[in-house]
Amino acid sequence: MPNPNVGMMYPVFAPLVSHTDGSMPTYGAGVVIQEARNATVSKTYNENPLYGDDRIVDDDNGMTALNISFEPTGLSDSDRVLLFGETLKGNVGGITAQVEMDNETPYGGFGYVRKMRDHGTYSYEAWITLKVKFTEESQTTATKEQNISWNVPTLNGRAAALDIDGSGKLSWRIHYSFTSASAAKTWLNTMLNVSTATT
């Protein structure tokens, strides 16, 4: 049976610089985005059965879309520039303000580590979505009451598939399983161009 997922850590995003069919994409400098709370991946499959002799004789059920809902503990100003393409605009009320503008949201690679458990033994799966762009479609702000309400951002990402091996088949994500969290993080750092000085 599949190992149950018992944790998540180390969310990383790197801007997509270029991609040529048949090769892995090239990424700019990646960063670790705060701490991870959860990520939900949803997939859409094509359902197009071929009927013959009053029955299904074949079916085209390839994946047509992949979406990610990601919840970090928060976003820094630099995270928002990287993820959403926000810009700095000078002399706004006498200061340089960060502005949400009608900019194109950039594509990038997004990765994280899934902690797995199998009868007391832990493993660490590093997952990378190769090409995805995120939006923050809502923002909740609330007054403080008797107990603090932790209003954290929810990012919605739509992925695009890439030909990374010349086969003509499109890939959405890659992953590898490691016996330690540090090894999984090191692989993400390598793949998504994260400097160890920033982690």
Q: Language-model segments: what does each one mean?
A:
Residues 1-40, 198-199:
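Polar/acidic, low-complexity leader/linker segments enriched in S/T/G and N/D
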Residues 101-137:
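Short helix-loop boundary/capping segments
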Residues 44-53:
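N-terminal "mature-chain" segments and other terminal, solvent-exposed stretches
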Residues 55-79, 149-162:
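Oligomerization/assembly interface segments of phage tail-like spikes and tubes
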Residues 132-199:
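Mixed-charge, glycine-accented linear interaction segment located at domain edges/termini
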